[in-house]
């Protein structure tokens, strides 16, 4: 089998490609560019495509996937597509309609994976970040287990093959896992993960529960000003990472991606640059030594790019716990 298509078994019997293409782009990127780069990613060998309601690009991503199916490049079952439930739809009765709305935009019959995007409920409605007259984001309170049960119904209805969570800490995962009515465990927890924030404790916990850890922001984020402090360190310029890149004659990005794969983490590579999209698939063409891995482990400084500081007062804010 082509190494590009390596997959990991999920706890529900489905399989997820270990390398994914992240489709998020800042609003200033023209939406038609989303179609082009998603097609490019599929042509380069990506079979796992990650998007979300919040990214406001599902129409374009769906168009790209359908055009690659139509031209015979791939079949629908070759593509593993992820969407995410946004925080303004955290009412049990809103969950399935939110997924159906994504499917309508995508013009697909099902998603391979549907995730709870963040564990924090916001005031229900169509505005992604609802604010009061003082400009403060409006929170909502909700039982996450009730939302999980609504996710389970989406799986039973065949609208999502697998269901999981994103940006959950250990305590929040345990709450779902210990829910007396639990029907399906989350198959994964998608979190920020890179050499500066290697999530080793959360990774060990997830492995112990047969939950896959998926790394977003694996290259240190696109540093979009809404989400990321502009003074934060640039991961891909790290001297240790660059030295390893030189040693292996690869880019620093490839070292960061390979690091995750060798830890058993599914990794999302986000790029809108044609050359880098093609390059990122080369992650299967080399290996890091155990010494390399140790050096990369030592870069950990528990540094988080996506802090969501405007939600820090939310009762379910996930990043105050150690992990």
Curated annotation (Swiss-Prot):
It is found in: Cytoplasm, Cytosol. One of its GO terms (biological process) is lipid metabolic process. GO terms for cellular component: cytosol. It holds the Pfam family Aldo_ket_red. Keywords: Cytoplasm, Lipid metabolism, NADP, Oxidoreductase. It comes from the Eukaryota. It is an enzyme of class 1 (oxidoreductase). Disulfide bonds: none annotated. The record marks 54 as: Important for substrate specificity. Substrate binds at residue 117. Its EC number is 1.1.1.-, 1.1.1.209, 1.1.1.210, 1.1.1.51. NADP(+) binds at residues 20-24, 50, 166-167, 190, 216-221, 270-280. The record marks 84 as: Lowers pKa of active site Tyr. Pathway: Steroid metabolism. It catalyses: chlordecone alcohol + NADP(+) = chlordecone + NADPH + H(+); a 3alpha-hydroxysteroid + NADP(+) = a 3-oxosteroid + NADPH + H(+); a 3alpha-hydroxysteroid + NAD(+) = a 3-oxosteroid + NADH + H(+); 5alpha-androstane-3alpha,17beta-diol + NADP(+) = 17beta-hydroxy-5alpha-androstan-3-one + NADPH + H(+). The active site is at residue 55. InterPro entries: AKR, AKR1C, Aldo/ket_reductase_CS, NADP_OxRdtase_dom, NADP_OxRdtase_dom_sf. GO terms for molecular function: 5-alpha-androstane-3-beta,17-beta-diol dehydrogenase (NADP+) activity; androstan-3-alpha,17-beta-diol dehydrogenase (NAD+) activity; androsterone dehydrogenase [NAD(P)+] activity; chlordecone reductase activity; estradiol 17-beta-dehydrogenase [NAD(P)+] activity; testosterone 17-beta-dehydrogenase (NADP+) activity; testosterone dehydrogenase (NAD+) activity. Cytosolic aldo-keto reductase that catalyzes the NADH and NADPH-dependent reduction of ketosteroids to hydroxysteroids. Liver specific enzyme that acts as an NAD(P)(H)-dependent 3-, 17- and 20-ketosteroid reductase on the steroid nucleus and side chain. Displays the ability to catalyze both oxidation and reduction in vitro, but most probably acts as a reductase in vivo since the oxidase activity measured in vitro is inhibited by physiological concentration of NADPH. Acts preferentially as a 3-alpha-hydroxysteroid dehydrogenase (HSD) with a subsidiary 3-beta-HSD activity. Belongs to the aldo/keto reductase family. Monomer. This is Aldo-keto reductase family 1 member C4. It comes from Macaca fascicularis. The gene is AKR1C4.
